[in-house]
Amino acid sequence: MQPALNAFTEQPADTAEATSRAGLEQAFALFNQMSSQLSESYSLLEERVTELKGQLALVSAQRMEELAEKERLANRLQSLLDLLPGGVIVIDAHGVVREANPAALGLLGEPLVGMLWREVIARCFAPREDDGHEISLRDGRRLSIATRSLNGEPGQLILLNDLTDTRRLQEQLARHERLSALGRMVASLAHQIRTPLSAALLYAGHLSEQALPTDQQQRFAGRLKERLHELEHQVRDMLVFARGELPLTDRVAPKALFDSLRAAAEVHVQGLQVRWQCEARGGELLCNRDTLVGTVLNLVENAIQACGPELRLKVHLYARADSLRLSVSDNGPGMDPATLARLGEPFFTTKTTGTGLGLAVVKAVARAHQGQLQLRSRPGRGTCATLILPLIPAAPLSAIQE
């Protein structure tokens, strides 16, 4: 009985051992499987890390190249600003100068960076009556000033351009041109002045006669006055053309200028068909009022002489942007392109009498007002002469301070 009992007892132990071994084998197989998966995942992770490192290195290299290119561009722009002949100033939202190139420092002096712009204006600028669209410094130089907003941030960019040398060269050139024509002018004027002067002397001689009736005295006195006015007109034209400069001391509203012109022209256009039209109301004109009115009267007289009694004349004053335009148009015979091209040259005239200085004087007066004269004409269609003059802002410096 004992051997049989032992056999029965050993059988369950073998079964338990086999079960335990199978569990271990299964666990070991599962461990191997998990290890293999982890190894594969680690390999994939290493590959991904390597790939990301490569991408990061590429992006970093590109970024560094972009930064280097931006730095080179910034250096080029800085060099360009340093070499610009014009001044460049950057002011922030509080009106403080943050940057200024060497040209700006040369124009306005130091200190500049860190100063309030309004303090710089008070220290450096000395506006004059004849500045127009330019502004004078205390040392006499003339600047043009332009402002631009800073895109994307508060503040302003101020551009300064020194026009002193340009204006001086323009004045010298105009002076040389006038001097080169002076000889011809003297000869022409001597001939033109002789006739009214001789007539004036003749009428003065008649007036000295004691027994002359009163009505004849008045007639001779009137003719003497006409000849003297003619002489005065020719001398005035000569002086304006020779000097080429005018003191611009009058600030006149366009409507006031129009009224002055209409009053002065009343005697000249009496009995003629004239249309007066004024469409400019705002702004001011920096000018020499008397000379400017006399210049426009020259244009009116030219139209009257060209058209005769059948004259239909229009005097039109209007504004375009920042300029004032005063046009005198007629229904006369007009001119061909060749004649129109020469019109305004000193001593060129299509009349049998006259010095040929009329339109040359008009051009000189327009230039003295920083404006220009435009002429349009067609044969059989009349002529239109237009003076274009700059309108002056009421307070050019206050806008910059703001």
Swiss-Prot record:
InterPro entries: HATPase_C_sf (IPR036890), His_kinase_dom (IPR005467), HisK_dim/P_dom (IPR003661), HisK_dim/P_sf (IPR036097), PAS (IPR000014), PAS-like_dom_sf (IPR035965), Sig_transdc_His_kin-like_C (IPR004358)
Keyword ATP-binding listed: yes
Segments crossing the lipid bilayer: none
Disruption phenotype: Mutant shows severe swimming defect.
Organism from which the protein derives: Pseudomonas aeruginosa (strain ATCC 15692 / DSM 22644 / CIP 104116 / JCM 14847 / LMG 12228 / 1C / PRS 101 / PAO1)
Pfam families: HATPase_c (PF02518), HisKA (PF00512), PAS_8 (PF13188)
SUPFAM superfamilies: ATPase domain of HSP90 chaperone/DNA topoisomerase II/histidine kinase, Homodimeric domain of signal transducing histidine kinase, PYP-like sensor domain (PAS domain)
UniProt keywords, alphabetically: ATP-binding, Kinase, Nucleotide-binding, Phosphoprotein, Transferase, Two-component regulatory system
One record GO biological process: phosphorelay signal transduction system
Classification via PROSITE patterns: HIS_KIN, PAS
SMART domains per the UniProt record, alphabetical: HATPase_c, HisKA, PAS
Enzyme class: transferase
Official protein name in the record: Sensor protein kinase FleS
Enzyme nomenclature, EC number: 2.7.13.3
Modified positions (Phosphohistidine) in chain numbering: 191
Purpose: Member of the two-component regulatory system FleS/FleR that regulates the expression of multiple genes involved in flagellar synthesis, adhesion, swarming, motility and antibiotic resistance. May function as a membrane-associated protein kinase that phosphorylates FleR in response to environmental signals leading to activation of specific gene promoters.
The reaction(s) this protein catalyses: ATP + protein L-histidine = ADP + protein N-phospho-L-histidine
MF term (GO), any: phosphorelay sensor kinase activity
Residues in Histidine kinase domain copies: 188-393
